[in-house]
Amino acid sequence: MGLSVGIYGGSGYVGVELVRLLAGHPEVGSLAVASRGHAGRRIGEVYPQVAVGGEYLDPSEVDVSSLDVAFVAYGHGESAEAVRGLLEGGVRLVVDLSADFRLPDVRVYEEWYGEHPAPELLGEAHYGLPEVFGALEGRLVANPGCYPTAAILALAPVVRRMGGEVRSVTINALSGVSGAGAKPSARTHFVSVNESVSPYGVSGGEPRHRHTPEIEIMLRRLGEAPPVTFVPHLLPISRGELETITVEAGELPGAEEVLGWYREDYGGWRFVEAREEVPHISHVANTNRARLSAAVDRRAGKLLLFAAVDNLLKGAAGEAVQNMNLALGYPEDLGLEHLR
């Protein structure tokens, strides 16, 4: 029979990647794809590049009681309401791709996002970066944000080993326009992004991107870590993400030592690789890989970490399927082998 899987928010950029991946997954028997904006339209009509049959359903048309697994790709706030209904409806596993369950402290969530619709579920959520925090043992996965995925993979081995020696962390991140979502806006219009690069998430003279507390909280689970300065930039490309992370610390390790830490921590995982060559976005676009590297500027006394991911795959849909695989006891790369 195979798994009965539902996708809520299946017409956004992340949602359609989920459709593409799960339609070809060997353990998925049936797929219900919900979209309020496109209910009744054929999936291939909305996204001709996706060779998947069937129509988008209105969320109310999905038989929740029949689902084994549900993926929720709504925005924050709306997502939590859907997750609550799915868990109450008996769905075996829910993978939420919004920010609603990434921050375990409701006070921190409300500072950055507003009132939380389902705070009683925060304690049930497992932060789904398996290479760092392992696989889920429960029913709810909080899929990480794209920027935190790259940042935490790069920083986790350093924080584990250097802890209180780290004095400051500055993350300079660049992402393709798909990271801003499918809904058009003046900021993501072709004329606005073409032949330009612009920082965002800076408000009132202060960097205030919502991924900042997510990165800080997860690093502090691993060891002593300072506040993080995080500034993302929009690139005039469709997909992909590159981060250059500057770490100030007391005694700096060598670049080869850091690469050794990466290989030690991630050697048993399929989708994280460390190389001496600095990563390019083109190295990881359209894959579920994260590529890491390191360098040391001894003249300035700084450690430089580099991380590249595809924001729609390892930064979202690919990681979500990886989390499903691990939670259900399948190999982590099942259905993702072509994305290694």
Swiss-Prot record:
An example Gene Ontology biological process: L-arginine biosynthetic process
Record bears the keyword Glycoprotein: no
Signal sequence extent: none
Keywords carried by this UniProt record: Amino-acid biosynthesis, Arginine biosynthesis, Cytoplasm, NADP, Oxidoreductase
Domain of life: Bacteria
Cell location: Cytoplasm
Molecular function, one GO term: N-acetyl-gamma-glutamyl-phosphate reductase activity
Xref: Pfam families: Semialdhyde_dh (PF01118), Semialdhyde_dhC_1 (PF22698)
Associated pathway: Amino-acid biosynthesis; L-arginine biosynthesis; N(2)-acetyl-L-ornithine from L-glutamate: step 3/4
UniProt keyword Amino-acid biosynthesis, yes or no: yes
Annotated Gene Ontology cellular component terms: cytoplasm
Catalysed reactions, as listed in the record: N-acetyl-L-glutamate 5-semialdehyde + phosphate + NADP(+) = N-acetyl-L-glutamyl 5-phosphate + NADPH + H(+)
CDD domains registered for this protein in UniProt: AGPR_1_C (cd23934), AGPR_1_N (cd17895)
Active-site residue list: C146
PROSITE patterns the UniProt entry points to: ARGC
Enzyme Commission number(s) from the entry: 1.2.1.38
Role description: Catalyzes the NADPH-dependent reduction of N-acetyl-5-glutamyl phosphate to yield N-acetyl-L-glutamate 5-semialdehyde.
Family assignment from sequence similarity: Belongs to the NAGSA dehydrogenase family. Type 1 subfamily.
Full protein name: N-acetyl-gamma-glutamyl-phosphate reductase
Species in which this protein is naturally found: Rubrobacter xylanophilus (strain DSM 9941 / JCM 11954 / NBRC 16129 / PRD-1)
